[in-house]
Amino acid sequence: MITPTVKMRILSSSHLFYLALCLLTFTSSATAGPETLCGAELVDALQFVCGDRGFYFNKPTGYGSSSRRAPQTGIVDECCFRSCDLRRLEMYCAPLKPAKAARSVRAQRHTDMPKTQKYQPPSTNKKMKSQRRRKGSTFEEHK
């Protein structure tokens, strides 16, 4: 007859075996060496690594690059024809963009619109100026 302590030891040893098997599986996949990635697998891996930043297929170069230089090697050359690791994939990620401040509609005033000048026909302006002159001259005469 099997006692409860014997059952516990049998159960524990089987759990220990499965635990060791899981650990070996996860550690071997986590420490796996570089692998080759081509086509959709390469794009999926770049999207996973780079996220929202996006990525380049060729390494970004400076503005002064000329076409006379040696042809560039891209991610396909490095990861499809040869094997590459995670660090190599990260080199092709686009740089982070600075976060834009969120603008609230409530924060904007309704008076932010530029004020337009009131339009007055030119004839009205001349009449008003002449009336002012007359008033000014009559005022001076009464003094």
Swiss-Prot record:
Region described as A: spans on this chain: 74-94
Predominant location: secreted
Cystine bridges: C38-C80, C50-C93, C79-C84
Biased composition (Basic residues): 126-136
One annotated GO biological process: insulin-like growth factor receptor signaling pathway
Quaternary assembly: Forms a ternary complex with IGFR1 and ITGAV:ITGB3. Forms a ternary complex with IGFR1 and ITGA6:ITGB4. Forms a ternary complex with IGFBP3 and ALS.
Family: Belongs to the insulin family.
Name of the protein in its database record: Insulin-like growth factor 1
Organism: Oryctolagus cuniculus (Rabbit)
Source taxonomy: Eukaryota, Metazoa, Chordata, Craniata, Vertebrata
